[in-house]
Amino acid sequence: MNKRIAIAGVLAAGYLACAQAMAQWELDSEHSSINFISVKNAAIAETHSFDSLVGYVGKSGNVQLTIDLASVETLIPIRNERMRDMLFKTVEFPSASIAAEVDPAILAEVDKGGTVSTEVPVRLSLHGVDDDLTVPVTVFSDGGSLSVVSSRPVIINAADFGLAGGVEALRKVAGLNSISTAVPVTLNLHFSHAP
């Protein structure tokens, strides 16, 4: 099983490398973030993130992002471990991906220094499930970089991706009354011109 996962990882990395060769913009992972909020006991909200993201925007407007789920960061090491093992099950599902198509006219407008607010249909692949979402974003550029920022959070329902059982396992092990399965997610993505 681990061999299959390793082979899949190598193939995915090879595909991403080939695709990035045709990229117009490459993700600046150091200055980008995908954040999500967990709400426990119906009153306590905490923000978490992922430390490892890769991605690109292609010349035709095709967008691909890959999230290393093992890089989840909650600022509490034992909680990081529990999310990796009990929620995301990263041995079996090491990454999530986001694919989208952006109208090239939007990229052209932004490349000239404009700012565009729009809604982008995306395909989220998470925990073996693919689902279509609409993400409201603001896109802008300072000439040397492209920024894509959530206009408002997108609500991800854990049950839609087969994660409700993992949320329940986390609730039990932490001794909580509840953890919401409706999870607000925000994007703050910055891309640099591909060489």
Model-derived segments and spans:
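Bacterial N-terminal signal peptides that target proteins for export
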Residues: 1-8
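Low-complexity, acidic/polar, glycine-enriched regions of mature
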Residues: 21-195
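N-terminal signal peptide c-region/cleavage motif recognized by signal peptidases
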Residues: 16-18
